[in-house]
Amino acid sequence: MESTWYLYILRCRDGTLYTGITIDVEKRFEAHCSGKGAKYTRGRGPLELVYRETCQNHSQALKREWEIKAMSREKKQELIENNG
């Protein structure tokens, strides 16, 4: 059986949003905060975890990540405010 995957959104110090997927949100967040996460988030801290969503598998998580990355900033904000 495949592990549960999570989609997450971080808010960076400069107000930008970073979307990613992982099987362990807390561990991945720590990696981002310590500069070992995505290149995009390095130097943009402090970071805030503002949204997480459970996905059934890796494939679903990738699909959802693509959907959210295609959203406008306004739509991402609505998602965070309504569900974050």
What is each model feature region?
Residues 1-84:
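GIY-YIG nuclease catalytic motif and its immediate N-terminal context
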